[in-house]
Amino acid sequence: MNAITNFLRKKNSSCALIPFITAGYPNIDICIKALKVLDREGADLIELGIPYSDALADGPIIQEASQAALKQGIYIEQVLSILTKVIPDLHAPIIIFTYYNPVLVRGVDKFICEISQAGAKGLIIPDLPLEEVDYILELCNLYSIELILFVAPTSSQSRIQLIASKSPGCIYLVSSCGVTGLRDNFDVKIQHLANNIKSTTNKLIMLGFGINNPDQISQIINWNIDGIVVGSAIITHIVGELPQDMLNSLAHFCKKLKYSIHTASNVK
């Protein structure tokens, strides 16, 4: 039932690399090939984002990718088709990243059932109201999907404890206020927040928003983080006119991130 948490726990002290890409971007064929490249080059888990027109938590790079995918007609139906085609060829479990409105429009029960049948193992809904969590959790448990809840830098201690009490096993810690995108460094209070979660709960932590280079990874590894999410920086490597050049660039970048995690983990 908690496939993502169980997977991360099996890695013991090793931090997981979790790349994010937008489903259907820049087109379905390259998206499928990109997922296979990420899997081959060391991704431990992969986040696949469902394109959405009002993606408030996403920065300009991911928003542009979503808009481009939507213009090509990439909606939930097409995302399910991508999952069905590619998951049998992947080792890395897939986590679906979507906003709540598309889930409601599709029908919550239907949506969670469909992503489960397509082979996804996890679900992230960044704008999910805390009041709705119990209902979503019930359906996720029914269909063996792990729901991963968000903790923001502005979350109070009482809210963190409430989120942790509802979380099946893994918390997504947002590295900064605002939207996703490329950043140079992280506020030390994020480290304190991560330490707080680790010391007061038994939950694992995925850290995301703004991670894009080896120096940041070296910093984050020392925070006892269980998984590092890289999104905008990944998407910048699948922009261009020559598909093979894009995939080669993506492979090189993913390999570099994986090496950085491995190296930083060994010197902790």
Swiss-Prot record:
What are its E.C. numbers?
4.2.1.20
Which reaction(s) are listed as its catalytic activity? Answer: (1S,2R)-1-C-(indol-3-yl)glycerol 3-phosphate + L-serine = D-glyceraldehyde 3-phosphate + L-tryptophan + H2O
Q: Which domain of life is it from?
A: Eukaryota
Keyword Cytoplasm found:
no
The active site annotation covers: 47, 58
Where does this chain mainly localize? plastid
Q: Give the quaternary structure.
A: Tetramer of two alpha and two beta chains.
Q: Which NCBIfam families match?
A: trpA
Spell out the protein name for this chain. Answer: Tryptophan synthase alpha chain
- What is this protein's gene name? trpA
